[in-house]
Amino acid sequence: MHVIVLGSGVIGTTTAYYLARQGAQVTVLERRAGPADETSYGNAGQVSPGYSTPWAAPGIPLKALKWMFQKHAPLAIRADGSFYQWRWLAAMLANCSAGRYSVNKERMLRLAEYSRDCLRTLRADTGIQYEQRTQGTLQLFRTAAQMEAARRDIAVLEECGVPYELLDRNRLPTAEPALARALDKLAGGLRLPNDETGDCRRFTLQLADKAKALGVQFRFNQQVEGLDVRGGQVAGVRVGGEQLAADCYVAAFGSYTRGFLRPLGLDLPVYPVKGYSLTIPMTDESAAPVSTILDETYKVAVTRFDQRIRVGGMAELAGFDLRLKEARRKTLELVVNDLSPGSGAVEQAEFWTGLRPMTPDSTPIIGATKYGNLFLNTGHGTLGWTMACGSGQLVADQVCGRQPAIRADDLALSRYGAGGQAGGGVARAQHNAA
């Protein structure tokens, strides 16, 4: 069976790898010069199932209003001139009830825990190295109110069997010794010992090499012009003046997947949520985290790689705007200087931004469509790295007709009531991802 995977970020590359492991002939089409060159390039570095929490949550509407007037707010909404932006926001607000939050968090935890297990198996099988650390992660609370909210939230962790430790202020240095310098700013923390960290881009580059060794063909610098469909099936991909045909197709274009598939009558509720990061050369190991610390107030993570510190987070809803904004850099600098002062040469940092493909319920869209040979793997939001291996394995199982190891039907596009029935004739989808 020949499968074409569209996109070579961490999601597309893991999908290609797992397909090849199951014996498929795989071709990956990518418009950039190599894998992990966009959203997977500079993310926060967390593989954190325990922090798989929906952005759509009780209290978020009121918080969003307050954040509009804060200088270092974790969320900013800027009109992009489209009606779709407001429709997407309305759908997100509809998911802010306690009931929807509980359902969505369970889905996210289920996939994220499975994905971490898949990553561990892959690491054992291949020996892949990507500056990973398996020392857990620590969410930091600056206020008693945040601590109390965490106590309410851990009920879901207990239901899903996720180990955790709720730490008061004085116990924080037992998990992260460098925090002894910042205790006066903190109320406590939530430690998740089974979470991990690592450089997503390095992982993706190495996994692409391992996929090539299994026979996967990567075609870079390819501008995908569209999909042709006939009789309820994808007939081929138009790229560079030629049509490439396969038995099955997997769309993993991240934030651009929605625009690519709309001409086919597939309305994916995916919106680009802009995030930022700094990658800082480490200068004082004793002042740096041993793993990841996550500032709950600013929604910013500070992650330790080998000789670098990655500071990433925040969310802007502003369409496909990729401009770097100095105000966001200052927020990242504020957090790292506050929690890990003197740990790195902040003035030498690489400043980066990327677009995370987010759904209104924060759960990715994985699985079949109304076209019998077209599958989706997108919409992971801020958890693409966390969920990548599990998502790739699920899609590979579905494409190859195998029973997935976990429930996956509620991750499909059909949960939104979208798609309908494929019609006859010829339809074309265009990849307008400039």
UniProtKB/Swiss-Prot annotation:
One of its GO terms (cellular component) is cytoplasm. GO terms for biological process: D-alanine catabolic process. The keyword Transport does not apply. The keyword Flavoprotein applies. FAD binds at residues 3-17. InterPro entries: DadA, FAD-dep_OxRdtase, FAD/NAD-bd_sf. Its EC number is 1.4.99.-. It is an enzyme of class 1 (oxidoreductase). Gene3D superfamilies: D-Amino Acid Oxidase, subunit A, domain 2, FAD/NAD(P)-binding domain. One of its GO terms (molecular function) is D-amino-acid dehydrogenase activity. Belongs to the DadA oxidoreductase family. Oxidative deamination of D-amino acids. HAMAP family: DadA. This is D-amino acid dehydrogenase. The gene is dadA.
